[in-house]
């Protein structure tokens, strides 16, 4: 019986070495160690052994069972590791394959121009002020020297929500709100960028567009200060050789008022299609803050003065990039936008 046990052990170990799958290993376990396995069947005949043989055969049987179980456990671990390596090899990512291409985004040309304008004025010591786009009639018109019966209100087609609430037509209300908050402190030196709304829609107008307005209030502010600031802005925005000129104009909230032109950067002032032969391009409106506006905001116009200016960001972008139709900026056509 001892020899039969050792022979079965050798057969079982040889079978385990050739097994390649967990299923094959389980079949070997059942064949030799199962309830009806060969080792189990052989051990059932131990009752026929003599008292002297039984302990010795029992010890050999335990050794055989233990050796088969240990070999089975070790082989099972190796088979699982081999299967894992095979699976990893089959699922390995080929790092040489090209990945999916994602287009790189970029800032919208209006955002680029807006940030450039802000950067220039911040370099001149201005701070950024913001306010609500849904505004009161008082701040949008009345506090800017535009009472309800003023004919200049016709210059701006307005989106009214109700008789006293509207979508702001310019960012000037931010200036009034800032003055009310700061009074009687000076100086005030702010720019007010943001969206504004008017009932216009054609090649050069949009019902929603962007403005940057500026305000300076302090003692002894003069028109020369206004001219110096805007000339510096024009040179930094359009080139150091850019010239500026101021033409008399009218705005209810400034007195005196002026339109600001720059020398055409396309023809250097000689006349071309861009400037319509004049050599000049209009870029913004400006003027000294009207005494009534200062007074309504809480300042004494006898003690402080100020200047204000305002420009359309779309207008600046169209001039800077040679865009002839405002609507191109809002069509979201990547073929157009990717040029900037």
From Swiss-Prot:
Q: Name one GO biological process term.
A: phenylalanyl-tRNA aminoacylation
Q: How is the cofactor bound?
A: Binds 2 magnesium ions per tetramer.
Chief subcellular location: cytoplasm
Give a Pfam family name. Answer: Phe_tRNA-synt_N
Q: What class of enzyme is it?
A: ligase
Task: Indicate yes or no for the key word Protein biosynthesis.
Answer: yes
Q: Which reaction does it catalyse?
A: tRNA(Phe) + L-phenylalanine + ATP = L-phenylalanyl-tRNA(Phe) + AMP + diphosphate + H(+)
CDD domains linked to this entry: PheRS_alpha_core (cd00496)
Q: Which family is this sequence assigned to?
A: Belongs to the class-II aminoacyl-tRNA synthetase family. Phe-tRNA synthetase alpha subunit type 1 subfamily.
- The protein's name: Phenylalanine--tRNA ligase alpha subunit
Q: Which organism is it from?
A: Desulforamulus reducens (strain ATCC BAA-1160 / DSM 100696 / MI-1) (Desulfotomaculum reducens)
Q: Which gene is transcribed and translated to give this protein?
A: pheS
